[in-house]
């Protein structure tokens, strides 16, 4: 590939051109002290070539003029031949490109010589100058077109196989009240679990490397001819358009601040999730590759390379920044916590990348804007986290939760907390200077992990303590003491299971787990006592009369019927806990009933015994099944 250097070719100069060049030499000699090194070199080359053709003085052979004239015309002709040619020189081959650059260099050399003259006084000089100027303009327009065509035709896209924005799983959408985020969807809830891994500053070729020498030759030629601005405008235009197309490929829409503030939660949730992926791809991959391309082409013009890169990337960067700025204007609602955490974490992660992309003063505004956005996201995320606890405390109920099952608030809070360990480093950083009362005093021991007393761990335990207080208040809405115990048992058991079966365990600690296991087991005991103590008392022997025994048997059956009708509507969703309750109750009730009948069945009389031991045992299995209405009572065996 031809490059612009100090070689001066003998190009199609006619007799007038030789005479003009002779004037150039004289003018340059007269002002030799004012010439830079390049122009002095040009002077020497001109003298050498003119001498070669016998024109060091005013006499020149006719044969020399004829040859020079022919070559001058060929140079102009070659430049004009590409004026309407729609193909690219790169496609035409290396030889064609070299010949074009050689012709351009010849014309530019003549123009440099003419510009050194104080003025062009005769028509001959004007004609030659005009011919060279027109040829140069044609060449520059053609190179500008060549640049755009080659960039378009040899553009490469960042491979989507490792940068796909759309996840293979669906987004989790949090309801704005505490009624969503059930166990069935929590598996899909974390934004971290399947995030595509993006290597730090993975440079992908945005343009086929095979054309880079050609593009660089175009840049050198246009810069040498003082057409640097048209080159930069064309280059910036094509690359900015390519970046915009890539943003569309990533499905990152441009939103105004008003758009973001008016979005419903489902749309905003999706847009925030997409932003966290796109901003990493753009800063860590695409713009890193774009900066590399600018340096490869314009590395010899460092300040211009930087300016071009900033102009190419500015619109896309501002679009991403504006979205982030608009998001932090939204209210700090609890359901937005995980999204804010994701945006903050990504914004903090890419700051090093942004600093590397825009290290100079010319890019300082973009660099500072990213740092400011990260700070705003940090503040907004912290406020949202603290308001999450307040929202739990203020969640009041006026009616008891049906069946004493696991309250929506408990599911929401615990499943939400399960997401947070993935943000441990970020939350520890955000919460380190915010004091909170903790239910677990700090102590040391082999079974105590340091993470148990991290800022995040203390705050999470405090949130659960607030949840427990809310559940205690909700339990007071039940008139039935047994159902109150079932409600607390269910919800405390649920909390323990969520902590034991997730990363929350290393944050809450085994002591917290033991304490809360004891708490729900205490509620099991309270349930059994409030439900069965008075009923089982009917089965005790006091040397009663037959009439009294029959009355006790009748009252037991009535009390058992009442328990059956009520507690088959109650809910114990945890199958293991439900089985344990069935076994525990069966041991106490069936054993007592069997003993009572064994001692007194003959005296009571079969017709006064409504249920057998097998009936009681089977009916107990229906308890806590949350039936819409009680099944028909087991067949009574009235005799």
Swiss-Prot record:
Annotated SUPFAM superfamilies: Cullin repeat-like
Oligomeric and partner information: Component of the exocyst complex and of the exocyst-positive organelle (EXPO). Interacts with SEC6, SEC10A and SEC10B.
Loss of function: phenotype: Unability to recruit a number of exocyst subunits to the exocyst-positive organelle (EXPO).
Record function comment: Influences the subcellular localization patterns of other exocyst complex proteins (e.g. SEC5A, SEC15A, SEC15B and EXO84B) leading to their recruitment to exocyst, well-defined large punctate structures throughout the cytosol. Essential component for the formation and the recruitment of exocyst subunits to the exocyst-positive organelle (EXPO), a secreted double membrane structure also called extracellular exosome, that acts as a sequester for cytosolic proteins to release them into the apoplast.
Organism: Arabidopsis thaliana (Mouse-ear cress)
Tissues showing expression: Expressed in roots, in the root-hair zone, both in root hair and nonhair cells.
UniProt KW Transferase keyword: no
Any one GO BP annotation for this protein: positive regulation of extracellular exosome assembly
Lineage: Eukaryota, Viridiplantae, Streptophyta, Embryophyta, Tracheophyta
Annotated transmembrane regions: none
Subcellular location: Secreted, Extracellular exosome; Secreted; Cell membrane; Cytoplasm
GO CC annotation, single: cytosol
Protein name listed in UniProt: Exocyst complex component EXO70E2
Family: Belongs to the EXO70 family.
